[in-house]
């Protein structure tokens, strides 16, 4: 029995020893495995942190983009809403269109004293005030021919009024919208005309400059009629020409039509940068370009103009005017398109009312750069006026 159990015991001990040895190896292996896993976790943590920072940066960038797009969309919606609201505002408040047509609230140049035309280089000009109607007062400038500038120094209004009866023709100048009779380009034209030997009488319509009253087409026309009659009462048999520029061409044709109807026409009519009628001009004006193709453009924008009594129908007036007509227009005019001036000429030239009178259209090439208000710079202007006004008498039929 002892011999049998001894090997078993030894085997058991060997197994125990072997088990003890294998247990130590397993523990060592386990420790190594744990160390490896820890190192892997540490390594993983080190690589995960940059990915996490990158993701956060991308999220912030996307957030900023979304915020920017939201603000941009909000701005676009506001602009679109404003764009759509304006036509309805104009339709509901037609007085807005009248303001935009007249622009009498725009006084350029600023800070000039209209009582002192000499401050604008017009040292042979007198400032008057006339009263066409009750509660309406208009400021007037009278510039005499430049050859008299020395004699004019220190003279009073009476002297200037008497000078109208001298042997010099008179031009009644009707300016356009915005600004005053002291506008830079207007003053330069007065100087040119004065140097050619003309008296120049100009004024600010009611509501412009220092003139008192509320602007309207009827009122502007009546102011012009009052000044014309005032000139005729003092000028004897001297020729009186009417010169209208831009919106002033509408006043000019209204005035001349009334004068022809009462059989006291002027000696000639000069239209600088004219249009056919206010509807066509408003539709062609650069201000209207963003709405020109807006659905219902005429109903929203043009009908309120005519419903306010503003027509300035030069094309219609041409049928009732009987006096020499000269039209001046620059091809590069950005305000009143050249084609409207040409169209007006094509209406006037064959009209029966002009059959006994000279009708002339003078274009100025776009290369000259005269645009809307610089035709006075043309060195050809004196010749054009001399040739035309020298033929301003009715042509006899043969």
UniProtKB/Swiss-Prot annotation:
Its EC number is 3.1.1.-, 3.1.1.23, 3.1.-.-. It is found in: Endoplasmic reticulum membrane; Mitochondrion. GO terms for biological process: acylglycerol catabolic process; adult walking behavior; monoacylglycerol catabolic process; phosphatidylserine catabolic process; phospholipid catabolic process; protein depalmitoylation; regulation of inflammatory response; response to auditory stimulus. It catalyses: 1-(9Z-octadecenoyl)-sn-glycero-3-phospho-L-serine + H2O = sn-glycero-3-phospho-L-serine + (9Z)-octadecenoate + H(+); 1-(9Z-octadecenoyl)-sn-glycero-3-phospho-(1'-sn-glycerol) + H2O = sn-glycero-3-phospho-(1'-sn-glycerol) + (9Z)-octadecenoate + H(+); 1-(9Z-octadecenoyl)-sn-glycero-3-phospho-(1D-myo-inositol) + H2O = sn-glycero-3-phospho-1D-myo-inositol + (9Z)-octadecenoate + H(+); 1-(9Z-octadecenoyl)-sn-glycero-3-phosphoethanolamine + H2O = sn-glycero-3-phosphoethanolamine + (9Z)-octadecenoate + H(+). Keywords: Endoplasmic reticulum, Glycoprotein, Hydrolase, Lipid metabolism, Membrane, Mitochondrion, Transmembrane, Transmembrane helix. The keyword Mitochondrion applies. Residues 96-398 are extracellular. It is a single-pass membrane protein. It comes from the Eukaryota. Residues 1-74 are cytoplasmic. Residues 1-15 have a biased composition (Basic and acidic residues). The active site is at 246 (nucleophile), 333 (charge relay system), 372 (charge relay system). GO terms for molecular function: lysophospholipase activity; monoacylglycerol lipase activity; palmitoyl-(protein) hydrolase activity. Disruption phenotype: Mice are viable and were born at the expected Mendelian frequency. Young mice (less than 6 months old) are mostly normal in their behavior; however, as these animals age, they develop an array of phenotypes, including defective auditory and motor behavior, with concomitant cellular pathology indicative of a neuroinflammatory response. Mice show heightened immunological responses. Metabolomic characterization of brain tissue show striking elevations in a series of lysophosphatidylserine (LPS) lipids that occur before the onset of neuroinflammatory and behavioral defects. Glycosylated. Its main location: endoplasmic reticulum. It holds the Pfam family Abhydrolase_1. Glycans are attached at residue 123. Selectively inhibited by DO264 (N-3-pyridyl-N'-(1-[3-chloro-4-{2-chloro-4-(trifluoromethoxy)phenoxy}pyridine-2-yl]piperidin-4-yl)thiourea). Lysophosphatidylserine (LPS) lipase that mediates the hydrolysis of lysophosphatidylserine, a class of signaling lipids that regulates immunological and neurological processes. Represents a major lysophosphatidylserine lipase in the brain, thereby playing a key role in the central nervous system. Also able to hydrolyze oxidized phosphatidylserine; oxidized phosphatidylserine is produced in response to severe inflammatory stress and constitutes a proapoptotic 'eat me' signal. Belongs to the serine esterase family. This is Lysophosphatidylserine lipase ABHD12. The lineage of its organism: Eukaryota, Metazoa, Chordata, Craniata, Vertebrata. The gene is Abhd12.
């Amino acid at each position: 029995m002892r011999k049998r159990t001894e090997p078993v015991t030894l085997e058991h001990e060997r197994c125990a020893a072997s088990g003890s040895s294998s247990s130590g190896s397993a523990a060592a292996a386990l420790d190594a495995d744990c160390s490896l896993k820890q190192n892997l976790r540490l390594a993983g943590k080190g690589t995960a942190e940059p990915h996490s920072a990158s993701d956060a940066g991308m999220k912030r960038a996307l957030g900023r983009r979304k915020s920017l797009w939201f603000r941009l969309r909000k701005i676009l919606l506001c602009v679109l809403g404003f764009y759509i609201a304006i036509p309805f505002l104009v339709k509901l408040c037609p007085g807005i269109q009248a303001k935009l047509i007249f622009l009498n609230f725009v006084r350029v140049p600023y800070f000039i004293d209209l009582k002192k035309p000499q401050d604008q280089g017009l040292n042979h000009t007198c400032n008057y005030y006339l009263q066409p109607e009750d509660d309406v007062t208009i400021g007037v400038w009278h510039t005499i021919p430049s050859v008299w500038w020395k004699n004019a120094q220190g003279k009073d209004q009476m002297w200037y009024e008497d000078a109208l009866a001298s042997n010099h023709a008179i031009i009644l100048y009707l300016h356009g919208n915005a600004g005053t009779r002291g506008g830079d380009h207007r003053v330069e034209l007065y100087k040119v005309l004065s140097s050619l030997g003309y008296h120049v009488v100009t004024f600010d319509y009611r509501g412009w400059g220092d003139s008192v009253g509320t602007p309207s087409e009827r009122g502007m026309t009546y102011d012009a009629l009052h000044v014309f009659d005032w000139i005729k009462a003092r000028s004897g048999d001297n020729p009186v020409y009417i010169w209208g520029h831009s919106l002033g061409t509408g006043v000019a044709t209204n005035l001349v039509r009334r004068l022809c109807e009462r059989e006291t026409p002027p000696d000639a009519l000069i239209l600088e940068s004219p249009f056919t009628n206010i509807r066509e001009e408003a539709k062609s004006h650069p201000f209207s370009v963003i709405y020109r193709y807006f659905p219902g453009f005429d109903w929203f924008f043009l009908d309120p103009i005519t419903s306010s009594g503003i027509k300035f129908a030069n094309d219609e007036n041409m049928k009732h005017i009987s006096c020499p007509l000269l039209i001046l227009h620059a091809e590069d005019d950005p305000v009143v398109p050249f084609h409207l001036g040409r169209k007006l000429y094509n209406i006037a030239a064959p009209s029966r009312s002009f059959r006994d009178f000279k009708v002339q259209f003078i274009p100025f090439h776009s290369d000259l750069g005269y645009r809307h208000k610089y035709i006075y710079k043309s060195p050809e202007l004196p010749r054009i006026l001399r040739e035309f006004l020298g033929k301003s008498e009715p042509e006899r039929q043969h």
